[in-house]
């Protein structure tokens, strides 16, 4: 039995659930999300609780059931509270400026990097070296944060680059002068 799927998902107040045959639609104050179940997994909704059921004879459906339960839980948290990721720009002259759905990054290239944000993601720049991304969809938020980080990943010698706020960069020691 899946250890993740056996726990029910509770639905907070202010969240609307629509459960069809193979799809679930979750809407709340932060937005709306939809998900289609894998073929061997289904869900039931009663008393503000969602339970995930699956074919226990197949190991594949056991794994998919745990994933489905986690995705439903993330959808509910996303539309009620939302998700947030913070990126830090470390380096001399590294700056970020947000305007609407566009993010302009100065990362030491000969030109500024322009990044067009998806519809579901909002951006704030509390300071020139800090970018705060917010969304109700955890997967899209992580993808956008990874794409922005990929423009200039942190390097191990000085730590310069775009990094997550909670990320630790393993530092390396520079080479010593030979034969001195």
Where are these regions (language model features)?
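N-terminal intrinsically disordered, cationic/polar leader segments
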Residues: 2-146, 150-180
């Amino acid at each position: 039995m899946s250890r993740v799927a056996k726990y029910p998902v509770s639905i907070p107040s202010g969240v609307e659930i629509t459960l069809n045959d193979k799809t679930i639609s979750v809407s709340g104050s932060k937005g709306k999300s939809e998900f289609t179940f894998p073929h061997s997994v289904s869900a039931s909704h009663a008393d503000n609780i969602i339970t995930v059921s699956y074919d226990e004879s197949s190991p594949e459906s056991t794994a998919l059931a745990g994933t489905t339960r986690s995705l439903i839980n993330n959808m509910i948290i996303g539309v009620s509270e939302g998700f947030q990721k913070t990126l830090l720009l470390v380096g001399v002259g590294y700056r970020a400026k947000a305007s609407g759905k566009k993010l302009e990054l100065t990362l030491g290239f000969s030109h500024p990097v322009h990044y067009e944000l998806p519809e579901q993601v909002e951006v704030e720049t509390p300071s020139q070296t800090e970018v705060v991304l917010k969304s109700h969809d955890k997967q899209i938020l992580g993808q956008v944060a990874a794409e922005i980080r990929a423009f200039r990943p942190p390097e191990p010698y000085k730590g310069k680059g775009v990094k997550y706020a909670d990320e630790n960069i393993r530092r390396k020691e520079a080479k010593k002068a030979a034969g001195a």
